[in-house]
Regions:
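Glycine-rich, positively charged active-site loop/lid region within alpha/beta enzyme cores that binds
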Residues: 103-128
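Catalytic alpha-helical scaffold of carbohydrate-active enzymes acting on polysaccharides/glycoconjugates
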Residues: 1-58, 63-112, 136-158, 166-201
Length: 201
């Protein structure tokens, strides 16, 4: 993606967003050997650095498929945080073994746009398989999840796929959610790298 859409990548960076790594060709890291994972990680980081000038500080594995070795390799290549696991509600330092840790910024399926909008089997298989969700229901879910995280001092991570949320009818969901979050007044909209700085990785 970085090499094919370098101008768009630079525009995203210019607008103040962080560029993190996500494999090279959307590889399932869990199915690769350690050597293959290392080659993918290296190629991904080099592609981003070549275009953006700086290496990425964060990594999210395509579809969340990874192994502990994936995180070790990411750390080896200078990655400072991961945002892959669904095992906590606050950032924490993932034990990589041998005294090594990596900041994990956990995600949750309820805050991911893909399951709501990308799956639509016809006929329904298995029986009762959900259809693409209604927009108002998704917005309500995301607001409720945010409210709960804010109420208990947790970390709300919204995971978005540009091809999913970027559809003309869906982008307004994100705008409405951001407006709602901003209205709360005491919310920190942080990049992963800012969280890494805060936690002192």
């Amino acid at each position: 993606v970085a090499e094919n859409y370098s101008e768009k990548l630079l525009e995203v960076k210019r607008r103040g967003h962080e560029i993190a790594a996500l494999g090279y060709r959307h590889e399932n890291m869990a199915l690769l050997t350690d050597e293959e994972q290392e080659a993918v990680m290296k190629k991904s980081i080099e592609a981003i650095k070549k275009i953006c000038g700086d290496p990425p500080r964060g990594f999210r594995s395509p579809e969340g498929e990874l192994t502990l070795e994936t995180l070790r390799i990411a750390k080896k290549y200078g990655i400072e945080y991961s945002s892959n696991l669904c095992d906590d509600d606050r950032p924490y330092f993932k034990d990589l073994g041998q005294g090594e840790t990596l900041l994990e910024i956990p995600i949750h399926w309820a805050n991911y746009d893909l399951p709501y909008f990308a799956f639509n089997y016809h006929p329904a298989f298995p029986a009762g398989q959900g259809r693409i969700a209604g927009y108002e229901g998704v917005l309500s879910n995301w607001k409720d999840e945010f409210y709960g995280c804010r109420e208990y001092g947790l970390c709300y991570v919204l995971q978005l796929d540009p091809a999913v949320i970027g559809a003309p009818g869906r982008i307004s969901l994100l705008e409405d959610l951001l407006d709602y979050m901003k209205e709360q007044g005491d919310v920190w909209f942080a990049r992963g790298s800012e969280m890494t700085n805060f936690y002192g990785n």
